Design a protein with these regions (language model features):
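Gly/Ser-rich helix-loop-strand patches that form or flank binding pockets
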Residues: 85-131
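Short acidic active-site motifs
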Residues: 52, 76-82, 108
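A glycine-rich helix N-cap at a beta->alpha junction
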Residues: 55-74
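A short acidic, often aromatic-flanked loop/helix-cap motif at beta-alpha or helix-coil junctions
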Residues: 73-80, 127-131
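Small/aliphatic-rich secondary-structure junction motif
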Residues: 2-54, 63, 120
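Structural motif
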Residues: 13-17, 43-46, 71, 95-99, ...
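General small-molecule cofactor/ligand-binding pocket signal
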Residues: 39-41, 68-72, 121-123
């Protein structure tokens, strides 16, 4: 099931161990505002998404919001950018934080987010630094 009219999709990239309710809520609200479908790509060790996502996935089903879910063992920043740029229906990419994805990067000298042709939404709650 997709929204009527021009197809738009929000791409949500989730890292196992970094599932934050604000991240999921941000993606959901963005989909509602844009009347967009939701495509979820999850980095996880197993074949199932992290259990912290169960309530969120149930909400999507209950509200009949169109979504797809793919669980992958690895996912690089560059892969997300290339994928989003190759699919013009991707309206935005939602991640927890640039810093979190930076930690996964093998080549930290590049910044593939700069090449992203749609908005990048970072939705993590920043921890306060104590001085």
């Amino acid at each position: 099931m997709t929204h009527p009219g021009k197809q738009r999709t929000v791409l949500l990239a989730v890292r196992e161990g970094h599932v934050d309710s604000r991240l999921l809520t941000s993606a959901l609200e963005l989909c509602r505002r844009l009347e967009a479908d939701l495509e979820i790509q999850v980095i996880a060790g197993g074949e199932a998404p992290p259990s912290e996502m169960d309530a969120f996935l149930n909400t999507l089903r209950e509200e009949r919001l169109p979504f797809s879910l793919e669980v992958k063992p690895t996912l690089r920043r560059r892969d997300l950018v290339d994928y989003a740029n190759a699919h013009e229906h991707i309206a935005a990419v939602v991640i927890d934080s640039r810093e979190g994805w930076e930690a996964l990067a093998q080549d930290r000298s590049s910044d593939p987010w700069k090449r992203l042709e749609c908005p990048l939404v970072t939705a993590a709650v920043h921890e306060k630094k104590h001085h």
